[in-house]
Amino acid sequence: MYNTINKNPILHNFSRLTQDSAVAKFKKEDKIKFEISKAEINCKLSNKKPDFTKMVAGSQQSVLTREALKKRKQKPVRELLKEISQLIQTLKPCFLMSPLSVSTYLDYDTCKFDAVIFDEASQIFPQDAIGSIARAEQVIVVGDSKQMPPSNFFMADFDDENEDDSLDFESILDSCQAIMEQKWLKWHYRSKSEELIAFSNANFYHNNLITFPSAKSESEDFGVHFYYVKDAIFDRKAKNNRKEAERVVDLVWEHFEQYPERSLGVVSFSVAQQALIEEIISERRKQNDIFAELFDSKREEPFFVKNLETVQGDERDTIIFSVGYGRDSAGKFYHLFGPLSKSGGERRLNVAITRAKYNVKVVASIKSHDIDLSKTTAVGTKLLKEYLECAEKGMEYLKRTITFNDSEPDSEFEIEVGDVLKNAGYNFDIQVGCSGYKIDIGVKHPKNSDYVLAIECDGATYHSSKTARERDRLRQEVLEKLGWKFYRIWSTSWFLNKKNEQEKLLQAVEKAIQEYDNNIDDDFIYKKNEEKESFIDEEI
């Protein structure tokens, strides 16, 4: 090793300070580049805007101005947009519309675009997309074939006992997959805990999603948790479960008491259970509307109650998931879970369980062992059984099915670093995380399981990144938002100045522990002040 370093001038003259400075400079300039690009685009668009102080009679500017000044008898939107099509696309070069709105309001001959982008394309019927496609030179279709397809669910009188009433159809995404070039978006940003996405990553995406571990250990406000409602009865006539719905509403109130700053959503398996939950919430608010502000629909992420069919596209900090189905008054449990039981129903489950950023609370009056797979062939039901077990057992289940924090070290270098930490008495994990991007070494706080420091050893993970932006900026920024603090050890520096690097490493760990403790103290003081202010407000 030392002979190799001495023979190579670049390695021999390697400097930690120089390398750290180069990385810091790149990160700063890379961010500036994006800001410059945004400014350039804004400048180009602004320069194209016409001067409304110099209008010619009959021009598109004069038509728009005249219509804007009218108090009544304005032209229909489609007619107006046709008449000022060139002007409106200069003023607003990007239109955000549904496929139906495009066909309704934009004239085919006069309103054309360089590109059309379909988002949530798995839910769009091909026939609904044709009008938009015809108006563009380029088509970009974005969607997830593992999520909700177009459905006639709300056009049918759905009966849980007749699983064929709701039919899924081919989407524009399905139509395009066979004929268009495909690119995968692998990075998953939403979940603050890998536990939230690990089940779907394994069962729907073949562990191809890149997820990011949190520095925070397991707790009640992170991950997936199970709430069993004993002796609840599924009303087969009303198709709902009142006792379970009441427990869901209890959790809504508890959430607003404990985490008023976090957004909240409730997802039910069925429309009937959704309606019952909404009814109980309404009844409680009539008795005491203490959380009126938190129910305000004008909040940035307002509270909602939705069902499997309507929740795609939404996300909240916390999701309460009501299964609803269970034993009836006679004690019988029918293995029918509405749209989940039919072909393709597993996609609805995937949507529902991936809406949360911080935690999912699964509320059910059945447990995983109650579902007998010999009585059903539905993939959705099978995965529901597994997800219930995941919620019941938490990390115990995930560690049994997915690799968490127990991979082998990347290199001898990583082992050496680990030995230094071990000899100094620190507790740590090797290869933290459960997807392709793992943190080389995560050092834990001596008094709990939270990680105080991520140690990166420029190993396989570092060198596997395809770009400098991904390797040196984006990945670390995402992890820092999840609470990580970083310390990088350059292998060349380690081998050239091992004693010095070991001392710096231990100093970095001690500093990280001290900063963690200071932050905990600051949070405690802040919460105490909040409680004091709240008490004063109540007294006033």
Labelled PLM ranges:
Residues M1-K112:
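Conserved helicase NTPase catalytic core signature
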Residues Q74-Y205:
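ASCE P-loop NTPase helicase motor core
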Residues Q86-Q89, F291-D317:
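Conserved motor-coupling elements within RecA-like helicase/translocase cores
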Residues C111-I117, D314-G326, Y334, K361:
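A short beta-strand element within the Helicase C-terminal
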Residues A156-K183, N201, S214, I281, ...:
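Helicase C-terminal subdomain and adjacent C-terminal extension
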Residues Q182-H225, K367-H369, S374:
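Coupling/hinge elements of helicase-like and P-loop NTPase modules
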Residues N208-I280:
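Conserved helicase/translocase motor-coupling segment
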Residues K438, G442-E477, T492-L496:
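Short beta-strand-loop-alpha-helix junction that forms the active-site gateway
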